[in-house]
């Protein structure tokens, strides 16, 4: 004798299409990041010679853009298809990945707070290694220039850090026109100049240190960032909380949809 149980369980269309809409944003953002990253690599000729990435001593910002794009594209695809096809495997992958990213972000934030000296040393090493490669990659160059201009700083701990770069080095072996100078992004802006003077940092470090602050920023970028964080702690905290809430919302939608699908499948087995 066979027994049957009729279940009223059904998959909620509300959660299903809400999760789909949530993930379509991820997917489209991932496509944009990947498109921008591949376009940037194409402009630099990296796509025709991938060894250019490994030859760069610093970090290529495009790599970070592509990594973010791959993660967002993959998660968005898994979430969209998983929701539309009611695929438990893809939904669990999406949910698990979001949970992992959430706890990684939380761990990084806690560790960065507890080990501030270690983070400061790693950032110094990172900044100095990228100073060495300043002229080797246009995207890296623009990133450093933006950082220095936005924070009115120069080098990791000061202008002398630019001695690490072969073009700005003050040694007698250097024949660069930029010898003993700094990038234009270190220069104190002149309100009277409407056009950026890209040569304003030439020969600045030949002069007495006491006169440097008349022409360039003398504060290091590590010190500038350490001062920036307390002033903007509420903004940083607000962004972190907003991202966390979005992730928790995505996890909730995925888990709810998984439960609905499992309930429907369980009802069909009787």
Swiss-Prot record:
Annotated localization: Cell membrane
Gene Ontology biological-process entries: positive regulation of Notch signaling pathway; protein localization to plasma membrane; protein maturation
Plastid is among the record's keywords: no
One Pfam family matching this protein: Tetraspanin
Statement: the UniProt record of this protein carries the keyword Disulfide bond: yes
PANTHER family according to UniProt: TETRASPANIN (PTHR19282), TETRASPANIN-14 (PTHR19282:SF261)
UniProt subunit comment: Interacts with ADAM10; the interaction promotes ADAM10 maturation and cell surface expression.
Region (Necessary and sufficient for interaction with ADAM10): 114-232
Cystine residue pairs: 153-221, 154-186, 170-180, 187-200
One annotated Gene Ontology cellular component of this protein: tetraspanin-enriched microdomain
InterPro entries: Tetraspanin/Peripherin, Tetraspanin_animals, Tetraspanin_CS, Tetraspanin_EC2_sf
Keywords: Cell membrane, Disulfide bond, Glycoprotein, Membrane, Transmembrane, Transmembrane helix
An example Gene Ontology molecular-function term: enzyme binding
Positions of glycan attachment: 169
Protein name: Tetraspanin-14
